[in-house]
C-alpha cells in the first residue's frame, strides 16, 4: 500500500497553503521550536481523536505550552500561552489502542487569535509570526560566540550528539541558530518557552548565550567533581593495594601489624593493671573496638587516648601514711609559726587515722586573709602524712567540665581537673588542695560548685563519675583541703560539706618572729647571700611590716625583704661595700618612701569624732566616725561609701537619740531645725557591716552634748532601737589593730568577752577592756559622764550663746515649762 504524501510547508511562504484554523495540542513537558523535530506520545482519548482527524487532512497541529506548566486532562483557552509552534506530523505509529507515537517537525511560531471550538479538542484561528533575519555586527558576534560555546558544550556533554555541533556551524539564520541551540541544551520548559516567546532575534540570542554559559559551567563543575571522586577512589585503591602488600611483607617477616601491637600492649596493661570491675569491663569493651580500627582512622586516636587514661590511673596505688604524731608536730612547727588551731586539728586527724585506719577523712577548709599560710599549710600536711601533694586553683573557674570533664563525643575531650591531677600524682590518696574555693563562678556552661558537692561528700565520692571516663573512681581515700579568703561567697550546700578552720591575721610581734625565723633566711638563700652580707635589726623589721605593708599575712612583707636583699646583692655584684646590718634609716634607699601611715588614737580630740574598730579581709583597722550638724530640714546624710547595713545602723542611732533626747538633756526641737551628717573617712573604700552602730551613736551624742570622747578609747558593737549592745565578729583582728594604733582601752559587747581567749597574751595585758550591755554603759565610759549620761535630776542649764549649734535645752525653754 502506498504511503500518503506529506504536505510541504515553509515558515515564510508555503508550498501548500496553510489553513485558517488549526487544532491545539497542549505540550506540558517540552517546547517545539521551528525547524526542530521532536517525538511525542499521546495517551489521552480526545487527542487520539484529534490525531485521527488531522492525519486524514493536512497533518498540521499547534503545539502550545500551558501557562502554569501543570499537567491537566482538560485545558481551556485561558490555560495556554499565547505563542506556540505550528507543527507538521511527519510520522505516526500506534503500537496499541492506548498509545500513539508521533514525530513532529516545527514549521513556524504562531500566535493564537480566537478559539473556534473547545470540544472534543481545542481549535483556534492563528497568525504566523515572521522574523527579521537581517544581521549586523553585534548579531554576527553573538552567533559566533554561541557557535564556539556550543562546540565546547558538545565536546563535554555526552547527551548532545557531535552532529549537532557541526550543524550549528552551518546555520546562517540567527533566529534558527538560537532555536536549535535552545532546543538541545538542558534547560527547563519555562526557560525554553521564554526563548520561544522572545520575538526579537538579537534579544533571543543573548538569552540563549546566558543559558548556554550557565549549562557549560554546570557541566565543567560536574566534570571537576567527577575527576576528584575518581582521583580519591584511585588513591584509596592504591592505599588498599599497598597495605595489602605491607601486610604480606610483615607476614613473611613474622612481624605483627602496628595496630595489633598497640592492642596487645593495651591488653597487657588491662590484665596487669588490677582495674575495678566496672573499669575493666569498659576498658575491655573499648579494646575490642580499638583492635578493629584502622590506624589511619580518626577514631583510632580517640580510642587510644581513652585506653591510655583507663590504664594509667592509680586505681589501686596508694602511699602509706606516716602516723608518727611527734614527727608530724615537728614538721608543722618547723614550717609554720603559730596557727595553733589548724595544727591541732591536723594532729587530731592523724591520731584518729592511727586508731581507725578506715575512718573517712575530713574536708578541711582554711579560711583567712591572703598571706596567712593557707596553701603552704596544705603542703605541710602532705609532708607530715608522707603523701603526694596536688593543688588546683578554682579562682575564676566557671565551667562544670573543669571538674567533671567533657563527654567523649566532643572533639578533644579530656577528663576533669580532679582526675587529671590524681593521675599526675600517681596515687589514689594524695593531699588534694582546692585553692580559692570561694572564687568559683557560674554561667551558662554550668555551676562548678555543684559538681564539687559530689567531690567533697564522703558519702558520695567513693563513686565519683567523670564524664570522660564514664566509670566511677574512688575519691574517698583522698584528703581534700580547701582554702578561702571569705566564706560568704561559698554556696551554703558546699560550705556544709567542709569543716571551716579560721586562720586569723598575725600580730606585729608574730610577724616580726616569722620574718626573722622564716622569711629572711629564705630570701638570703634565694638571692645568694650569706648572713655576713645582710641582717635586719628588730626595728628595721618592724618598720618594714608597719610602714611598707598593710596586710593580715606576710606575703607583701616577704616581697619587701626580697627587694632589700636584691639591692644588697646588686651592690655586692658591682664590688661595692655593704654594711651588712639593715637599720630603719637604710630602708629608704632600697624601698623608697614610707607607703602607709597608721591612724592613732591621738586624732579623736573633738566632739562628734569617735574611733571605731573594723574588720577587713587583710586584718583589723581603726575607723574614725565623724558627725556634724548644720541648719536645715533634710534629716540625716551619710557619706564615705557606706553599705546598706551601716546606713541602717546610722538611722537606728539617730532614732534612739531622738527617742531619748530628754534623758541626755538634748533639746527635742533641735532635730527639726538641724540636719546631721555622718562621714567615715577614706571615702574611696566601700564599707559595710553592723559593727559601727555603737560608734555612730556615740559620735552623735558627743556632737549634741559638746563632749569629747575619752582619749585612747575605741569601740565596736551593734545596737538595737532599745539601746541594747549586740555582739559582732572579728574581735581578735580589731583588738590587734587597736593595739597597733596605740589604743589603751576598748569597749566591746559583753557577749564578745569569750573572744578575748583568742587574743595574744602580750596584747591583752597591754590593754584594758570594758564590756557593755546597753548604750548607757558605752556613753558613761566614753564621755566620762559629762552630760551624756541619763539625768537623775532636772536642773536648769545656763543660757549662753555658742558658735556651735548647741543641742542642750536653753534656759528660756525651761522657763516656759
Swiss-Prot record:
Composition skew (Basic residues), residue ranges: 789-817
The UniProt entry lists the main location of this chain as cytoplasm
Catalytic residues at 691, 734
Q: Where is the Lon N-terminal domain?
A: 22-216
- Location of region: Disordered: 784-817
Q: Which residues bind ATP?
A: 368-375
Induction line: By heat shock.
Subcellular location(s): the record lists: Cytoplasm
Protein name per its UniProtKB record: Lon protease
Self-association and partners:
Homohexamer. Organized in a ring with a central cavity.
Q: Does the keyword Aminoacyl-tRNA synthetase apply?
A: no
Pfam families according to UniProt: AAA (PF00004), Lon_C (PF05362), Lon_lid (PF22667), LON_substr_bdg (PF02190)
What task does this protein carry out? ATP-dependent serine protease that mediates the selective degradation of mutant and abnormal proteins as well as certain short-lived regulatory proteins. Required for cellular homeostasis and for survival from DNA damage and developmental changes induced by stress. Degrades polypeptides processively to yield small peptide fragments that are 5 to 10 amino acids long. Binds to DNA in a double-stranded, site-specific manner.
Task: Specify the Lon proteolytic domain's residue ranges.
Answer: 604-785
Source organism lineage?
A: Bacteria, Pseudomonadati, Thermodesulfobacteriota, Desulfobacteria, Desulfobacterales
Any single GO molecular-function term of the entry would be: serine-type endopeptidase activity
UniProt similarity note: Belongs to the peptidase S16 family.
Q: EC number(s) of the enzyme? A: 3.4.21.53
Domain of life from the UniProt record: Bacteria
Which InterPro entries did the record assign? AAA+_ATPase, ATPase_AAA_core, Lon_bac, Lon_bac/euk-typ, Lon_lid, Lon_proteolytic, Lon_Prtase, Lon_prtase_N
Q: Which reaction does it catalyse?
A: Hydrolysis of proteins in presence of ATP
Q: What is one term from the GO cellular component aspect held by the record?
A: cytoplasm
Amino acid at each position: 500500500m502506498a504511503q500518503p504524501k506529506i504536505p510541504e510547508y515553509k515558515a515564510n511562504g508555503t508550498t501548500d497553503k496553510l489553513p485558517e484554523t488549526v487544532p491545539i495540542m497542549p505540550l506540558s513537558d517540552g517546547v517545539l521550536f521551528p525547524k526542530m523535530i521532536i517525538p511525542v506520545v499521546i495517551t489521552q482519548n480526545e487527542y487520539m481523536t484529534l490525531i485521527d482527524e488531522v492525519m486524514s487532512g493536512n497533518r498540521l497541529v499547534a503545539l502550545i505550552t500551558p501557562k502554569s506548566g501543570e499537567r491537566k486532562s482538560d485545558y481551556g483557552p485561558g490555560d495556554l500561552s499565547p505563542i506556540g509552534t505550528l507543527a507538521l506530523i511527519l510520522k505516526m505509529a500506534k503500537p496499541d489502542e492506548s498509545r500513539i507515537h508521533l514525530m513532529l517537525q516545527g514549521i513556524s511560531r504562531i500566535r493564537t487569535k480566537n478559539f473556534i471550538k473547545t470540544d472534543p479538542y481545542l481549535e483556534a484561528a492563528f497568525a504566523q509570526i515572521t522574523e527579521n533575519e537581517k544581521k549586523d555586527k553585534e548579531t554576527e558576534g553573538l552567533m559566533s560566540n554561541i557557535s564556539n560555546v556550543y562546540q565546547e558544550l558538545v565536546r563535554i556533554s555526552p547527551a548532545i550528539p557531535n552532529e549537532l555541533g557541526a550543524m550549528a556551524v552551518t546555520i546562517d539564520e540567527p533566529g534558527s541558530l538560537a532555536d536549535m541551540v535552545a532546543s538541545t541544551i538542558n534547560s527547563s520548559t519555562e526557560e525554553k518557552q521564554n526563548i520561544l516567546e522572545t520575538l526579537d532575534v538579537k534579544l533571543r540570542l543573548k538569552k540563549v548565550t546566558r543559558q548556554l554559559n550557565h549549562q557549560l559551567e554546570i557541566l565543567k563543575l560536574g566534570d571537576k567533581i567527577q575527576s576528584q571522586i575518581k582521583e580519591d577512589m584511585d588513591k584509596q585503591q592504591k592505599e588498599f593495594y599497598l597495605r595489602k602488600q605491607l601486610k604480606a611483607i610483615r607476614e613473611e617477616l613474622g612481624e605483627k601489624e602496628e595496630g595489633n601491637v598497640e592492642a596487645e600492649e593495651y591488653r597487657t596493661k588491662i590484665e596487669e593493671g588490677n582495674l575495678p570491675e566496672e573499669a575493666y569491663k569498659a576498658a575491655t569493651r573499648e579494646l575490642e573496638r580499638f583492635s578493629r580500627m584502622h590506624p589511619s582512622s580518626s577514631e583510632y586516636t580517640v580510642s587510644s587516648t581513652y585506653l591510655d587514661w583507663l590504664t594509667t590511673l592509680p586505681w589501686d596505688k596508694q602511699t602509706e601514711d606516716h602516723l608518727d604524731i611527734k614527727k608530724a608536730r615537728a614538721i608543722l612547727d618547723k614550717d609554720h609559726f603559730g596557727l595553733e588551731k589548724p595544727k591541732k586539728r591536723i594532729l587530731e586527724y592523724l591520731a584518729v587515722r592511727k586508731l581507725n585506719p578506715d575512718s573517712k577523712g575530713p574536708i578541711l577548709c582554711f579560711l583567712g586573709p591572703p598571706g596567712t599560710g593557707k596553701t603552704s599549710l596544705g603542703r605541710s600536711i602532705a609532708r607530715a602524712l608522707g603523701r603526694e601533694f596536688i593543688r588546683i586553683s578554682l579562682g575564676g573557674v566557671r565551667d562544670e567540665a573543669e571538674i567533671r570533664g567533657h563527654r567523649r563525643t566532643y572533639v578533644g575531650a579530656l577528663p576533669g581537673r580532679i582526675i587529671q591531677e590524681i593521675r599526675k600524682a600517681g596515687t589514689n590518696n594524695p593531699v588534694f588542695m582546692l585553692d580559692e574555693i570561694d572564687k568559683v563562678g557560674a554561667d551558662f556552661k554550668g555551676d562548678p560548685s555543684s559538681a564539687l558537692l559530689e567531690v567533697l561528700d564522703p558519702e558520695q565520692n567513693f563513686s565519683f563519675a567523670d564524664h570522660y571516663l564514664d566509670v566511677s573512681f574512688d575519691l574517698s581515700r583522698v584528703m581534700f583541703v580547701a582554702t578561702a579568703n571569705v566564706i560568704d561567697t561559698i554556696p551554703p550546700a558546699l560550705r556544709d560539706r567542709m569543716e571551716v578552720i579560721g586562720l586569723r591575721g598575725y600580730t606585729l610581734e608574730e610577724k616580726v618572729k616569722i620574718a626573722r625565723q622564716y622569711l629572711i633566711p629564705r630570701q638570703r638563700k634565694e638571692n645568694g647571700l650569706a648572713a655576713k652580707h645582710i641582717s635586719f635589726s628588730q626595728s628595721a623589721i618592724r618598720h618594714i611590716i608597719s610602714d611598707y605593708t598593710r596586710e593580715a599575712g606576710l606575703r607583701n612583707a616577704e616581697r619587701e625583704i626580697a627587694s632589700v636583699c636584691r639591692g644588697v646583692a646588686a651592690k655586692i655584684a658591682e664590688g661595692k661595700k655593704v654594711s651588712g646590718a639593715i637599720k630603719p634609716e637604710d630602708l629608704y634607699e632600697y624601698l623608697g618612701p614610707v607607703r602607709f601611715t597608721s591612724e592613732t588614737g591621738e586624732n579623736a580630740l573633738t566632739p562628734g569624732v569617735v574611733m571605731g574598730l573594723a574588720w577587713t579581709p587583710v586584718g583589723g583597722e581603726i575607723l574614725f566616725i565623724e558627725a556634724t550638724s548644720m541648719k536645715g530640714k533634710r534629716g540625716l546624710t551619710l557619706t564615705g561609701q557606706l553599705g546598706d547595713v551601716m546606713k541602717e545602723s546610722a538611722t537606728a542611732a539617730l532614732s534612739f537619740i531622738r527617742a531619748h533626747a530628754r534623758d541626755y538633756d538634748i533639746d527635742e526641737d533641735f532635730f527639726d531645725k538641724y540636719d546631721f551628717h555622718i562621714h567615715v573617712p577614706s571615702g574611696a573604700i566601700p564599707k559595710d557591716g553592723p559593727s559601727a552602730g555603737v560608734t555612730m551613736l556615740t559620735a552623735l551624742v558627743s556632737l549634741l552634748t559638746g563632749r569629747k570622747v575619752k582619749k585612747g578609747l575605741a569601740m565596736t558593737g551593734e545596737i538595737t532601737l532599745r539601746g541594747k549592745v549586740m555582739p559582732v565578729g572579728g574581735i581578735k583582728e580589731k583588738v590587734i589593730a587597736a593595739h597597733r594604733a596605740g589604743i589603751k582601752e576598748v569597749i566591746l559587747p559583753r557577749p564578745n568577752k569569750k573572744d578575748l581567749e583568742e587574743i595574744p597574751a602580750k596584747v591583752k595585758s597591754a590593754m584594758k577592756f570594758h564590756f557593755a550591755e546597753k548604750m548607757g554603759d558605752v556613753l558613761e565610759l566614753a564621755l566620762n559622764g559629762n552630760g551624756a549620761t541619763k539625768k537623775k535630776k532636772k536642773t536648769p542649764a545656763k543660757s549662753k550663746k555658742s558658735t556651735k549649734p548647741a543641742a542642750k535645752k536653753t534656759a528660756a525653754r525651761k522657763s516656759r515649762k
